[in-house]
Amino acid sequence: MYTSIYITDSKKNLVFEYLLTSQAPTFQQLCSKIAGRDAAMDAMVAISKDMSLYRQAVGPEKLWYWALCQACGDPLEPQMFLAQYHQVLIEYFDKEALTVKKLVNNADRLALLLHAMLDAGEVAVTDSNRLRQLVPLRNDLSTILNSATKTLANTVKYADSKQLFGAPVATGKVEAGQTVPWRTADCRYVNNEIYVDLVETVNATLRQKGSSLTLINGSLSGKIDVKCYLSGNPTVQLKLRTSGHPLDNSALHRCVELGEAGVATMNFVPPDGRFTLAEYAIDLSAISQAARRLTNLGLVTVSLASGLGQHRDEFEIKVIIGNSTQVAAIEDLRITVYFPDISDAAKIKILRTTHGGWESDLSRVRGVWAFDKQTAVGSVPVLRGCVENPESTPHAPPVFPSHLAVSYSHVGQLPSGIRVDTIALSDLPPGSKPFKGVKYTSRAGDYIVRA
């Protein structure tokens, strides 16, 4: 049973709270129970004998969702609900990411959504389409109120008393039932459009062995997001070119009906608005060919060499960015370099860099090689440097980086090579000329290169 829901930033600053009972504690009252815990804290904190506080960090927005539950048998259930609530907010506001300002300015919407989703502390409604009907957006609600006010004003202005008080009561037209529960009945759009966004995140750990890289473990996390603004009750058939990757264990939206080709052919009646059609994961370690494993890491390959130079005390980081006619540039490329063995008196000295610049960290155990907003494909950026020991210890052993953390993104192709083959639409209103758009986005998640 849910007692209260809270939203904070990663520093535990309260953004929103929803108390289901008058006895439910505020987040400020709970802070003493979670004081001193860092970002790596447990996902569950016992508050009392039969009450626990669950935490879920969702998305790149660095928002923390909290649920105070009483007598919860399954510890995964609150975390799944919090992740689902975050997804409901994403789809409700039709945003790719949520900000603190957005949540603060729409606190009433957040409370109304939770009021609709929870009944007596138990989950009741989670369908985004149904929630949009129960809790209209501000612009939709304003349109309804303005229309009702205008109609009432015209009726009072032009009708006489006999019409007002002697006419029979008009009965409203009963709308036909929904074709499917996840889609609003009788949708109408001026511009019929459907956008399919495929996003893949690279998570990999590699080790430098001589001049070659060896994959220790790696995976690709992908999802297919759809924004659908189609009139009527259309049927969509989405065909994928999977590039030989089995996607049998994908998590699919309940609207999907699989064809004989499995996830490669998906038929569905789409919800209106934004929704996640499918999520999948590709285990790179399961690929038998080593060369193909590295190919599926994407366009960016980073290597680390140590013991270079006349005194064998230099290190070099090389970034090889592959050529692609589908990708214009690599965006927000950053490489964080870690020196755990550096002394307080030592200094990191950059000898040569072909791209970007070096940013020193106050902790002195790491630095960041930061590139421009965009880096051209086909380029090979190189950074060479060394760690200078103080004059008091001139014969100290050289210090080299222990590992690198890589982050970047680009648009145009996926590391796995998966692409949309066709998007076929049927059962649209006569004369409709829908627009179809496809976008591919690649990102680096936990991408580590060890020395």
Curated annotation (Swiss-Prot):
SUPFAM superfamilies reported in the protein's UniProt record: Second domain of Mu2 adaptin subunit (ap50) of ap2 adaptor (SSF49447), SNARE-like (SSF64356)
Name of one Pfam family that matches: Adap_comp_sub
Signal peptide: none
GO biological process, one term: endocytosis
Function description: Part of the AP-3 complex, an adaptor-related complex which is not clathrin-associated. The complex is associated with the Golgi region as well as more peripheral structures. It facilitates the budding of vesicles from the Golgi membrane and may be directly involved in trafficking to the vacuole.
Domain MHD: 191-450
Organism: Eremothecium gossypii (strain ATCC 10895 / CBS 109.51 / FGSC 9923 / NRRL Y-1056)
Subunit organization: Adaptor protein complex 3 (AP-3) is a heterotetramer composed of 2 large adaptins (APL5 and APL6), a medium adaptin (APM3) and a small adaptin (APS3).
Main location: Golgi
Lineage: Eukaryota, Fungi, Dikarya, Ascomycota, Saccharomycotina
Similarity comment: Belongs to the adaptor complexes medium subunit family.
Superkingdom to which the source organism belongs: Eukaryota
Protein name: AP-3 complex subunit mu
Keywords, in A-Z order: Cytoplasmic vesicle, Golgi apparatus, Membrane, Protein transport, Transport
Keyword Iron: no
A GO CC annotation given for this chain: AP-3 adaptor complex
Compartmental location: Golgi apparatus; Cytoplasmic vesicle membrane
Statement: the UniProt record of this protein carries the keyword Transport: yes
